[in-house]
Amino acid sequence: MASVAVENYLKSMWELGPADVATQELAQHLAVAPASVTRMLQRLSERGLVAHTPYRGASLTAAGERKALTVVRRHRLLETFLARTLDLGRDQLHDEAERLEHALSPALERAIDDYLDNPQRDPHGHPIPGPQGELPPEGDSPLGGWPLDRPATVSQVPDRDAGMLGWLESQGLVPGCELRMVARDPFDGGVTVKLDGRLLQVAASVAEEVRVSDGGAV
């Protein structure tokens, strides 16, 4: 088994978890055939990296989660490095980091971490796991469920959808920006927020991907 494939599977399961991940869901996430996923899960189970129940899905074991978080750490450090040193846009970072993350040695990982002064979050606002895989507790919520008339600060935006990221960037809806929830459509779940002195309508699908926390005085 190629280590790149193993790392991709483990990282994808971590992203889709923590509950059991269905074979079909994992196949869609990785853009591979369900039969290929089933075979790989069986092999990962034999290696003690996943707990796999046929027809019910799979979840990471403690060993599998540690390996997954190692890849997540590399990926998010690389995104941060590429943004700070090469000034790549947020919509470019994910794909470039995907290509590089499997080739990053532990020594280079430490060097990048030191060079960046041990960053806590990547440019999308996602927490960067520590060297032992430790993650801070999440204290943010999806924008779609944020209370009306309550100020908030955007903490995270999605990293996989370049089109969505491009739109968020164009509207200034990025980590660190301050907003206030103004209205929520009771039918389609879309929201209206006040951002930079203007009203912005955000589709439900986007509002569920953007995460916010308390803060701001908009």
What are these language model-derived features?
Residues 23-24, 42, 62, 80:
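Residues within the helices of the helix-turn-helix
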Residues 56-75:
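Basic, amphipathic "hinge/linker" alpha-helix immediately C-terminal to the N-terminal HTH DNA-binding motif
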Residues 102-209:
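Mid-protein regulatory/catalytic core that forms ligand/cofactor-binding pockets
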